[in-house]
Amino acid sequence: MNDSTAPTAPAELSEFIENRTYVEIQVGDQSVLTRTLRPEDIQLFAIMSGDVNPAHVDPEYARSSLFHEVIAHGMWGGALISTVLGTEFPGPGTIYISQTLKFSRPVKVGDTITITVTCMQKFDHNKHIVFDCVCTNQDGLKVIRGEAEVLAPTEKIKRARMAMPEITISDRDARYRRLFGRAQGLKAVKAAFVHPCDLSSLQAATSVRDSGLMEPVLIGPEARLRGLIEQHRLKLGTTRIINVSHSHAAAARAVELARNDDVAALVQGSLTTEELLRAVIMPHGLRVAGRLSHVLYIDVPSHPRPLIITDMMVNIEPTLAHKVDIVQNAIDFAHLMGVPEPKVAVLAGIETVTPRMRATLDAAALCKMADRGQIVGGVIDGPLGFDNAVSLISARAAGLKSVVAGQADVLLAPDLESGNMLAKQLEHLSDAISGGVVLGGQVPIVLANRGDSVDSRIASCVLALIVANQYRSRRRA
């Protein structure tokens, strides 16, 4: 699940906000409001109030609490009572005098709460009104009961309802936790960290080790590595270091370890991508029948599901034959990530096929190859522009009738440049989180950008772990 945007107002609200004056209200009059509690309501209330009691915001803690799950802040219900009094009954011009509340049972995520405010007493000498306030859940059980006293408005007020700004809750940690959770229950693997002569690489290595995801093997100049570890006060523990003099030798040794099944994954350190991949694709490297390609698993907060972008790091100008392998690798990876029949959008600048744009010809050919069973396991459509690949609104406006258009799981970029720019735009301008891995070799390979955070590197290691476990199962079968 991705980060969400809170609606500005329920659909049933009118465009005007209007009060009921003291003389218009009679004893026994009521107003009713209904709300369903969402996880983001709890998050937003916690952010606004500063009340980060773990009973409300920490699912792990909540499971061991009295109610065994996250519950709403008590004052969320109180705020809904205030909403009725301040916006509907009496409405604008109302001034709170006092409020009592008694909490009978918890409100949980998914509960639908009905707030009923009833006029109980009126005092003509000061225009005060006492209201009975009751909140019941979807089972008709009272969760909150109280009494409010207000100074009611004496003048009629009717104004256009103000349009409130959208609020997006961006919880990067939660999105990373969801991704890391995919490794739960998987067996840790040995991974060669190739020339990890920088802080981020070493932090990632120690983090995946401490998390039980991987058993890192550090390959590089031992004296330099130990110096960095000591300088940054990292705990080496029993982590093995293989001493080699330079980055070329580190890449070669890592490939040798993988070829001999001594490690199940490679993780790029501070050497260049070209340097590492050159060792991988050597005649006695790690290539198998298909072509190597990179997949980026990216979670954009404004999008309803994660996307897989390929290829942004390995194939510079892929041919049609190359794209067949790239698409198949991405489909197989999507299966591992829980997408049973991934929808693949072959991206181009336009939706029509024209010989003047090679990307459109490749898209048409790939679709036909999928029809003929030359690419299996997914549904492919293209050419599609990026907007029509990810937005149903755009796809419908363009008149595109396709199960892929607007609902793509996989985005195949025309070339490395476009894929790289697309991915980095989402990462840097849309607050996306991501992890990537190279597929198609004997073992998965994690490539790193200089600007990658430690969390991003760990995310990539999680993906490599998922793939490595699949490769291991396949070999045993």
Language model segments and positions:
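Hot-dog-fold acyl-thioester-processing enzymes
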Residues: 2-94, 98
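Buried hydrophobic positions in well-ordered alpha/beta secondary-structure cores of metabolic enzymes
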Residues: 28, 45, 74, 81, ...
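A residue-level detector for short acidic-glycine micro-motifs
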Residues: 83, 103-105, 119-121, 137, ...
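Mid-chain, well-packed structural core segment of small domains
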Residues: 87-111, 115
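Anion-binding alpha/beta catalytic cores of soluble intermediary-metabolism enzymes, centered on
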Residues: 169-217, 221-404, 409-477
